[in-house]
Structures are given as structure tokens and as C-alpha cells.
Amino acid sequence: MSSRSELLLEKFAEKIGIGSISFNENRLCSFAIDEIYYISLSDANDEYMMIYGVCGKFPTDNSNFALEILNANLWFAENGGPYLCYEAGAQSLLLALRFPLDDATPEKLENEIEVVVKSMENLYLVLHNQGITLENEHMKIEEISSSDNKHYYAGR
């Protein structure tokens, strides 16, 4: 029997016009948007799905990084997420957003993925303006148009 996340993922794939996408054996589904933004969906349980935006590896050579990340996380928390977290296996910074499955639709999922993408864009720009660059071979700061952002953006 398919989980609610699996059924939603099938409808989402149909809505955006791609073939089939599915969760792997670890209950993750990853894909790229515009070959820049890497998103992972986690079939966490039957109550909610997690949406992760993979931002990149932690820079180890910048002393202001931890303070900027804490400041960013506070701002995201004040605006309802997504939240910054660390994935130890990949040594990467992620943006994480909990997506409740009650009354979920492909449109709502797409909107929340867009929230994560917009938040990734803005996080990159704010960190870039502070002289901090996350190591991410896919996201190029020059491809993001408005580089004069001074505040974090939750996309909602």
C-alpha cells in the first residue's frame, strides 16, 4: 500500500509534467530545479513530509559563518521557516521545512518547495554580501539576479 507521501509525489510529478519520481529505499526523493537548486523530499512519516534545500558545504575558513547562520535561523524561525540544519554525512548546510500531509495537494507542495528555493537564493545572497560563500558546485551566485538583498526572505 502506498503512503500518503508516495501518492502526493505521484500527483506532483504528474502536475509538473515529469515522468515518475519516487522515494528510494531510504525514503528520500531528490531532484534539481533549473539545474541549480537541489531539493530532497523525505517521507518522514504518515503525518508530514520534509522538504530539504541542499545549500552546500560549510566553509571552514570564515569566523563569522556560525554567527551569520544563527542570525539567519532566527530570522527564518520568526517567519515560519524553513530552518537551517546540518547534514553530517554530506557535511552540508540544509534548509528544512516540515510539510503536513493533511489536506496536502500537489499545488501546496509546489508552493512550499518554492518557499525553500526562494529562501536558498536569499541565504546565498546575504551570505555572499557578508563575504561568505558556501561550497556548492551547482548554485552560482551570478545566476541569481538581485544581489543587493540585505535581509533574509522566507518566500511567504
Swiss-Prot record:
Key words of the record: Chaperone, Cytoplasm, Virulence
Chaperone as UniProt keyword: yes
TM regions (residue ranges): none
Annotated phenotype, changing L67E: Abolishes Tir binding
Pfam families named in the record: CesT
SUPFAM superfamilies: Type III secretory system chaperone-like
Any one of the GO BP annotations: protein secretion by the type III secretion system
Record has Cytoplasm as a keyword: yes
CDD domains assigned to the protein according to its UniProt record, in alphabetical order: T3SC_IA_CesT-like
Reported effect, W75E: Abolishes Tir binding
One annotated Gene Ontology cellular component of this protein: cytoplasm
Location relative to the cell: Cytoplasm
Assembly mode: Homodimer.
Function of the protein: Chaperone for the type III secretion of Tir. Probably stabilizes the protein, prevents inappropriate protein-proteininteractions and aids in secretion.
Sequence similarity: Belongs to the CesT/SycH chaperone family.
Name used for this protein in its record: Tir chaperone
Biological source species: Escherichia coli O157:H7
Gene: cesT
